[in-house]
């Protein structure tokens, strides 16, 4: 079982900046980050999210998002891919960074999930 990280943001700059930050502590994990629409504007796109999921080399993906439609697109993609997605409702930067660092260090999925549960955003 291989695990990877997927980041979905409405902003191309947030997605690329967070990916760059994560690469400082997690150089070897499978990481994809998508932000914005096809034309570079703010928003999310089902097709771009699906591509980010499919481009990730891992079979089991820990996914992180910034706002509502990013979550909605992850939910839709999770129904249409063979990959196993776990969608975390945690702060995007802190959650993705923590999960990536732990994954790089060889932590189990359960250990990562336990750490992220402390960050859960209540509805």
UniProtKB/Swiss-Prot annotation:
GO cellular component entries: membrane
PROSITE patterns referenced in this protein's UniProt entry, alphabetically: PTS_EIIA_TYPE_4 (PS51096)
Pathway terms, separated by semicolons: Polyol metabolism; glycerol degradation
Transmembrane stretches, start-end: none
Active site: 10 (tele-phosphohistidine intermediate)
Boundaries of every PTS EIIA type-4 domain copy: 2-123
E.C. no: 2.7.1.121
Gene3D superfamilies: Phosphotransferase system, mannose-type IIA component
Top-level division of the source organism's lineage: Bacteria
Keyword terms: ATP-binding, Glycerol metabolism, Kinase, Nucleotide-binding, Phosphotransferase system, Transferase
GO biological process, one term: phosphoenolpyruvate-dependent sugar phosphotransferase system
Reactions performed catalytically: dihydroxyacetone + phosphoenolpyruvate = dihydroxyacetone phosphate + pyruvate
Induction note: Induced by dihydroxyacetone via the DhaQ-DhaS complex.
Top-level EC class as recorded in UniProt: transferase
Gene Ontology terms, MF aspect: ATP binding; phosphoenolpyruvate-glycerone phosphotransferase activity
UniProt cross-references to InterPro entries, sorted A to Z: DhaM (IPR039643), DhaM_N (IPR012844), PTS_EIIA_man-typ (IPR004701), PTS_EIIA_man-typ_sf (IPR036662)
Pfam families: EIIA-man
PANTHER family: PEP-DEPENDENT DIHYDROXYACETONE KINASE, PHOSPHORYL DONOR SUBUNIT DHAM (PTHR38594:SF1)
Subunit description: Homodimer. The dihydroxyacetone kinase complex is composed of a homodimer of DhaM, a homodimer of DhaK and the subunit DhaL.
Domain note: The EIIA type-4 domain is phosphorylated by phospho-HPr on a histidyl residue. Then, it transfers the phosphoryl group to the EIIB type-4 domain.
Role of this protein: Component of the dihydroxyacetone kinase complex, which is responsible for the phosphoenolpyruvate (PEP)-dependent phosphorylation of dihydroxyacetone. DhaM serves as the phosphoryl donor. Is phosphorylated by phosphoenolpyruvate in an EI- and HPr-dependent reaction, and a phosphorelay system on histidine residues finally leads to phosphoryl transfer to DhaL and dihydroxyacetone.
Note: Unlike the carbohydrate-specific transporters of the PTS, the complex DhaKML has no transport activity.
Protein name: PTS-dependent dihydroxyacetone kinase, phosphotransferase subunit DhaM
Gene designation: dhaM
